[in-house]
């Protein structure tokens, strides 16, 4: 190894994002990455974007104060039973404040109701499952009740799509 008197050039190479990406896709990914200025803005504590008092999940509050790099390293864990119970109690407390107590207790026993936090937009299109629809079902034999027989076909025909001769939907 002989010392070389000529000055050496240092070559800096930018590692490719992913070897299987074409250069155009790599450029699009690079453009979408946040700049340091936007990272500072999003991690700013004085930012009024999120009201932490309105967030019921204490784990979410702690992740908001983390930097994006710390949030990326953190793996998602399922909530413990205690955390889940506090979230449910918080949700039910909000429901009781907005609705009358009778409606909230009836909706919790219904198996067809939507999960908490999701508005039930399809209730108008579904057949009525309370009172009137269940009275005729009581007179039917128990085998039909166990199979979950729907009300008469007259009620459902308005909600069914027309089918062609092969059974495919025309719409």
From Swiss-Prot:
One of its GO terms (cellular component) is extracellular space. Residues 19-29, 137-148 have a biased composition (Basic and acidic residues). The keyword Secreted does not apply. One of its GO terms (biological process) is glycogen metabolic process. Residues 17-171 are annotated as: Disordered. Residues 9-12, 42-54 are annotated as: Essential for activity. The modification N-acetylmethionine is found at residue 1. One of its GO terms (molecular function) is protein phosphatase inhibitor activity. InterPro entries: PPP1R1A/B/C. The modification Phosphothreonine is found at residue 35. The modification Phosphoserine is found at residues 43, 46-47, 67. Keywords: Acetylation, Carbohydrate metabolism, Glycogen metabolism, Phosphoprotein, Protein phosphatase inhibitor. Interacts with PPP1R15A. Inhibitor of protein-phosphatase 1. This protein may be important in hormonal control of glycogen metabolism. Does not inhibit type-2 phosphatases. This is Protein phosphatase 1 regulatory subunit 1A. It comes from Rattus norvegicus.
């Amino acid at each position: 190894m002989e010392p070389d008197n000529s000055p050496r050039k240092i070559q800096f190479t930018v590692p490719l994002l992913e070897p299987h990406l074409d250069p155009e896709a790599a450029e699009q990914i690079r453009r979408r990455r946040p700049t340091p200025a936007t990272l500072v803005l999003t991690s700013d504590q004085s930012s009024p974007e999120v009201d932490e008092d309105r967030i019921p999940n204490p784990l979410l509050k702690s992740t908001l104060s983390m930097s994006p790099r710390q949030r990326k390293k953190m793996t998602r864990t399922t909530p413990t039973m205690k955390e889940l119970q506090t979230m449910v109690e918080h949700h039910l407390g909000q429901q009781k404040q907005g609705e009358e107590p009778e409606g909230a207790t009836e909706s919790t026993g219904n198996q067809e109701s939507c999960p908490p936090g999701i508005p039930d937009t399809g209730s108008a299109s579904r057949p009525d499952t309370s009172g009137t629809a269940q009275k005729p079902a009581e007179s039917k034999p128990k085998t039909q009740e166990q199979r979950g027989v729907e009300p008469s076909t007259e009620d459902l025909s308005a909600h069914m799509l027309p089918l062609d001769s092969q059974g495919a939907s025309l719409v």
